[in-house]
Regions:
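Substrate-binding pocket helix/loop in short-chain dehydrogenase/reductase
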Residues: 91-92, 99-104, 195, 199
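Short C-terminal tail/terminal secondary-structure segment
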Residues: 140, 219, 230-244
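A conserved structural motif in NAD(P)-dependent oxidoreductases
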Residues: 203-214
Length: 244
């Protein structure tokens, strides 16, 4: 098999739809062996290079189970994409502690635990790529995004620290920062015509991005070509955040 990721094994969480599904499909098309993970088994076509796993990333045994599944299917691990995430909107006055904790449990704690389980395999190879899903909210705030915004700031800080800790082992760590993208998670927001008009107007590109627009830079960051790129956030926003 030829392709940018030929011979590499990738784990992609949150792979049943949206950005995670687009990344899993593109990695597979570019030659990678992919373990696609989601709460319900992803509907991707399983084959010799695509394995599917139904797993709650917050479960106590999730990190070990996910790593074991990748090893059983493909014999190792090279690339980890921590894409699984949730958004439970709420301002400081109405965000419940339960919803705050749940956002951090999925968006930060699970990401940390799975990464912790994956790193030894990458260290043993002397090569690895860790790609976390941040957001433009990793740098900014937004209305009623108290918990979500804080969790994505945490993803940015965690990823930068990973880059410092792991660079000597041939492992890079970066995070993607999409703005509004057409996904299942964004659907409740996209149904608001004012929200949609805001992002279409803010982006010089004049439209809202698709999951495939996020998958393309995710491919580069997982490749050998990105060996000197680490600790960075990549904004995928159609130029929206360049506008004053």
């Amino acid at each position: 098999m030829t392709g940018t990721l030929a011979g590499k094994t990738a784990i992609v969480t949150g792979a049943a739809s949206g950005i995670g599904e687009a990344i899993a499909k593109l990695y597979h098309a570019e030659g990678a062996q992919v373990l696609a993970v989601d709460l319900a088994e992803p509907g991707l076509p399983a084959d010799a290079r695509m394995a599917l796993l139904a797993m709650d990333v917050t479960a106590g045994d999730a990190p070990d189970a996910i790593i074991a599944a990748a090893q059983a299917a493909f014999g190792g691990l090279d690339i980890l994409v921590n894409n699984a995430g949730i958004c439970l909107p709420g301002s400081i006055e109405d965000q419940s502690l339960e919803s705050w904790d749940r956002v951090f449990e999925v968006n930060v704690r699970a990401l940390f635990r799975i990464t912790q389980a994956a790193v030894p395999l990458m260290k043993a190879k002397g090569w690895g790529r860790i790609l976390n899903l941040g957001s433009i909210m990793s740098d900014f705030g937004g209305p009623s995004l108290c918990a979500y915004g804080a969790s994505k700031h945490a993803v940015a800080g965690f990823t930068k620290s990973l880059a410092v800790d792991l660079g000597a082992y041939g492992i890079t760590a970066n995070y993607l920062q999409p703005s509004a993208i057409w996904t299942g998670m964004s659907k409740p927001f996209m149904e608001d015509p004012d929200f949609r008009a805001y992002w279409e107007g803010k982006a010089p590109a004049g439209y809202i991005g698709e999951p495939e627009d996020v998958a393309a830079p995710a491919l580069f960051l997982a490749s050998d070509a990105a060996r000197f790129v680490s600790g960075m956030g990549f904004r995928i926003c159609g130029g929206a955040m360049a506008r004053f």
